[in-house]
């Protein structure tokens, strides 16, 4: 999809409050990818992505911006934590595993797309097998079973939860060998033994999915899938490296820990600069993958990164701590607004939450104060507050009553939290519904 930077920011605004500078930076980076794709090959190969590094406290939207961006354009995306990697030669994950993870995501994306493309071709085969399974079920209790009616019921999804016995491919879990090589012994011996089938009992819904997968795999060219997946990862892949500040030592390495952190930085450097990483699907060039790094940078500074790595993240963005106004917007404005999430959950049990405006002010004020006075958790602070605020409502709701309105106003919030600055877990008001 060819979104303009303004359109990208507009889409991000639907889910993320504030952080205009970060949204603008990623929007421009994404649009530049599209611009690059329209250039002649000889020019295109000279233009590499401008990687981004974000600085800001936890919970202010760093990860969500990158994730929503990838979802918006259908790009393969992985989030990794810098602290999980160790220097080459030590036990732990090597940095190249982030590229292998990205390719795995890309393969799944391409395979899912191919599966949808061939679904109409394989569906008659799947339906035939399911009708036969349903026929065997029904003939036990019915003398005259109409296969055409079974097929229609199947297409109308009238028997989704009925249990049937079908013969499907037996897929044992692959054996994983941990270590720097991360060898998957299961995939290593793929194709050396004939596929095994076994009869399994499952619902029609799950049987359809299993049979669709099996029949699709028979006609999907996996060599073609792998080629497309590698190209997709190379040209559109996005890797989000979180907690990058945790692998940054102080200005001068003074301990073995600082030296080790610098070693991880130097291992990451060729990946970000552009190198070729071998995977089980083929070699992957990292030159045009977009890297987005992020960290709180409470102790270390961006300037403490090794200079070579600093140079590979030319776009630097500072994300702001959330204000009371931001918290109030998070409660009500986004498509996935916090109050809407809890309202949808409790409506299952016939509870209609009604949040008054003064209650939203109170909750937002509490979130801002607690983040300022204690640890800054960003938007995650709201979930802590909301869980405690609605604990009694959630506990007492059974769904065995007509739809009830529960009004949440300032007084209700203050009764639950007698001190705005601290959550007191053992001080809960007597629960009651306001109809």
Report the location of each language-model feature:
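Non-catalytic accessory segments flanking P-loop/AAA+ NTPase cores
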Residues: 1-435
């Amino acid at each position: 999809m060819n979104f303009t930077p303004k359109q990208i920011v507009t889409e991000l605004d639907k889910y993320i409050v504030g952080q205009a500078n970060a949204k603008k930076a990623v929007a421009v980076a994404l649009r530049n990818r599209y611009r690059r794709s329209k250039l002649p090959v000889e020019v295109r190969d000279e233009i590499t992505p401008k990687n981004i590094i974000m600085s800001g406290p936890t919970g202010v939207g760093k990860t969500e911006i990158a994730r929503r961006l990838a979802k918006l354009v259908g790009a393969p995306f992985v989030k990794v934590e810098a602290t999980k990697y160790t220097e080459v030669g030590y036990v732990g994950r090597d940095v190249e595993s982030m590229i292998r993870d990205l390719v795995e995501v890309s393969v799944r994306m391409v395979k899912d797309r191919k599966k949808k493309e061939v679904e109409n071709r394989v569906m008659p085969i799947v339906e035939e097998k399911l009708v036969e399974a349903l026929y065997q079920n029904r003939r036990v209790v019915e003398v005259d079973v109409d296969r055409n009616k079974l097929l229609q019921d199947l297409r109308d999804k009238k028997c989704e939860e009925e249990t049937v016995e079908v013969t499907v491919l037996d897929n044992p879990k692959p054996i994983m060998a941990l270590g720097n090589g991360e060898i998957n012994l299961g995939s290593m011996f793929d194709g050396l033994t004939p596929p095994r089938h076994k009869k399994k009992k499952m619902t029609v819904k799950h049987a359809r999915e299993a049979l669709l997968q099996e029949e699709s795999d028979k006609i999907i060219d996996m060599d073609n899938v792998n080629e497309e997946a590698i190209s997709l990862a190379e040209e559109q892949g996005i890797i989000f490296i979180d907690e990058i500040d945790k692998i940054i030592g102080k200005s001068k390495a003074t301990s073995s820990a600082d030296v080790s952190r610098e070693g991880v930085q130097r291992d990451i450097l060729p990946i970000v600069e552009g190198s070729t990483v071998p995977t089980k699907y083929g070699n992957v060039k990292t030159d045009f993958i977009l890297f987005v790094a992020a960290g709180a940078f409470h102790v270390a500074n961006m300037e403490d990164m090794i200079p070579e790595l600093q140079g590979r993240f030319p776009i630097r963005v500072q994300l702001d701590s959330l204000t009371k106004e931001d918290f109030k917007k998070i409660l009500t404005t986004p498509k996935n607004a916090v109050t809407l999430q809890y309202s949808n959950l409790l409506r299952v049990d016939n509870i209609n939450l009604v949040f008054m405006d003064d209650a939203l002010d109170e909750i937002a004020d509490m979130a801002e104060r607690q983040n300022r006075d204690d640890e800054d958790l960003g938007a995650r602070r709201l979930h802590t507050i909301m869980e405690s605020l609605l604990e009694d409502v959630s506990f007492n709701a059974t769904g065995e009553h007509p739809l009830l309105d529960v009004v949440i106003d300032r007084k209700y919030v203050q009764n639950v939290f007698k001190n705005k600055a601290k959550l007191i877990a053992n001080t809960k008001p007597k629960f009651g519904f306001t109809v």
